[in-house]
From Swiss-Prot:
The keyword Hydrolase applies. It is an enzyme of class 3 (hydrolase). It catalyses: dTTP + H2O = dTMP + diphosphate + H(+); UTP + H2O = UMP + diphosphate + H(+). It comes from Leptospira biflexa serovar Patoc (strain Patoc 1 / ATCC 23582 / Paris). The active site is at D65 (proton acceptor). Its EC number is 3.6.1.9. Its main location: cytoplasm. This is dTTP/UTP pyrophosphatase. InterPro entries: ITPase-like_fam (IPR029001), Maf-like (IPR003697). CDD domains: Maf. Its cofactor is a divalent metal cation.
Length: 191
């Protein structure tokens, strides 16, 4: 069985669209950043924490996390409307990076991987930022935005679209030998 250790609706949808039969079993963890912890150190620690310690040999476990980084600082999920405005104002008209990391736990061990996507934002005024927040309610999204949002702030990107949605799909697919059995099992049951 394939166990997704995440409550993210976007990760769930990406994997469902690929044909996975998922068991959703998120870990509830402290997502506080440690003092002097770099963004990539934080990302890896979060992914491994979300993976948890449970392991059943017939299962493949997947955990993931996404961070938005500007000037080597993580812009976390906003806590309220004012925080979302603050974050979007910082990013307006500028470039930043989105990192999504994931870990697969399988019978032979655990493998961690991540991807980076470069994002260029539109230069929005205060009114445009407030309208976007009202329209999109980006409170569950790192960086206060979704690349998939209509009339959103993303002007351009270099890298993976699904990475910005919260899942490093290219890296995941390149490790197909780790999860192909779970996927084939699902396909066989459909026939």
């Amino acid at each position: 069985m394939f166990v997704l250790k995440s409550a993210s609706p976007r990760r769930k949808q990406i994997l469902f669209d690929l044909g996975f039969d998922l068991k959703i079993d998120p870990e509830h963890i402290d997502e506080s950043q440690k003092e002097l912890e770099s963004p990539l150190e934080y990302l890896e620690r979060m992914v491994h924490s979300k993976l948890g310690t449970l392991f059943e040999p017939n299962n493949v476990y997947l955990a993931a996390d996404t961070i938005v980084v500007y000037q080597n600082q993580i812009l976390h999920k906003p806590i309220d409307t004012n925080d979302a405005f603050r974050i979007l104002k910082i990013l307006s008209g500028k470039n930043h990076s989105v990192f999504s990391g994931a870990a697969l736990r399988h019978p032979n061990g655990t493998e961690y991987f991540y991807e980076e996507t470069m994002i260029g934002f539109q230069n929005w005024n205060d009114f445009e930022i407030n309208e976007y927040i009202k329209r999109s309610k980006p409170f569950d999204k790192a960086g206060s935005y979704g690349i998939q949002d209509k009339e959103g702030p993303v002007l351009q990107w270099i890298g993976s679209y699904t990475n910005v949605m919260g899942f490093p799909l290219r890296s995941f697919l390149s490790r197909h030998e780790l999860w192909i059995g779970s996927w084939e099992e699902r396909i066989m049951r459909r026939d």
